[in-house]
Amino acid sequence: MEWIQSLPKIELHAHLNGSIRDSTLLELARVLGEKGVIVFADVEHVIQKNDRSLVEVFKLFDLIHKLTTDHKTVTRITREVVEDFALENVVYLELRTTPKRSDSIGMSKRSYMEAVIQGLRSVSEVDIDFVTASDSQKLHNAGDGIGRKKIYVRLLLSIDRRETTESAMETVKLALEMRDVGVVGIDLSGNPLVGEWSTFLPALQYAKDNDLHITLHCGEVPNPKEIQAMLDFKPHRIGHACFFKDEDWTKLKSFRIPVEICLTSNIVTKSISSIDIHHFADLYNAKHPLILCTDDFGVFSTSLSNEYALAVRSLGLSKSETFALARAAIDATFAEDEVKQQLRFIFDSASPEHV
């Protein structure tokens, strides 16, 4: 399905640290092995595998946590992730990451995010726009290169479910301070079995009151009370929605909250047993707003083109239906109106090729 590769695409649920190239992971892990921080032989085969088990996925996440603790590495992986998305014709990317603090190496939440921004600045393989359109001083490196790919990148700061209310509030305030470098929203993610909704609600409400967009990992595990509370909060989007009951679907659909669909991730993590029973089909047939996403393309050995191919095979979508699905994602982005207008132009310019 080469036409899917060339289709303009929008990615709205991508975790920075889960989207690292295998080759980069291998290189960084080898260095850690030489330093005696890890046993390289224990992780080498996991990195090189394409079809990873759930146990191996978690092992990889543990390794990534150890690898992404210095500013230089954060900058490098940010640059590579953006370039990888752009090369498969992703024209707009919302990249999410949890600002990290590591006192031992002098890393604060702010310095971590500054390393991410430096990664955006250092992108050279493609043209990139990562500053909100209202900012008069464009910091992107778009050099009017004819034939060069261009990608719009916006950032979401993630609140980890292990955090306290105070720490969550700190992340929201940092997001507000970094709006001029493309931060457009807040994500709530992390181990869904950890933390209480009431812990994060004050920070999320503060973010909403200050016009930051909100997306929530919702329904990753069975937790009816939390799912209802999250939906009542009326976030701008939710991710996954794997363990919804009928009343949850009813509320979601009545509120028209867009859903970030991560097919491969849901199957690998066994949140959904088979793509044949995935809720993607029901939402699509109900004409509910949804967006196909990768979640962690490195860890789950996928790509956005692959996610579209899965959807096409699963539902038997035509080229024109697939194009319409990809274009509809524009309305769910957290981008400013000027960028949405540019994205519509990009899709409409490509439509004769794909319809």
Curated annotation (Swiss-Prot):
It is an enzyme of class 3 (hydrolase). Zn(2+) binds at H13, H15, H217, D295. Keywords: Cytoplasm, Hydrolase, Metal-binding, Nucleotide metabolism, Zinc. Gene3D superfamilies: Metal-dependent hydrolases (3.20.20.140). Pfam families: A_deaminase. Its EC number is 3.5.4.-. Its cofactor is Zn(2+). It is found in: Cytoplasm, Cytosol. GO terms for molecular function: deaminase activity; metal ion binding; N6-methyl-AMP deaminase activity. The active site is at E220 (proton donor). InterPro entries: A_deaminase_dom (IPR001365), Ado/ade_deaminase (IPR006330), Metal_Hydrolase (IPR032466). Belongs to the metallo-dependent hydrolases superfamily. Adenosine and AMP deaminases family. Monomer. This is N6-mAMP deaminase. It comes from Arabidopsis thaliana (Mouse-ear cress). The gene is MAPDA.
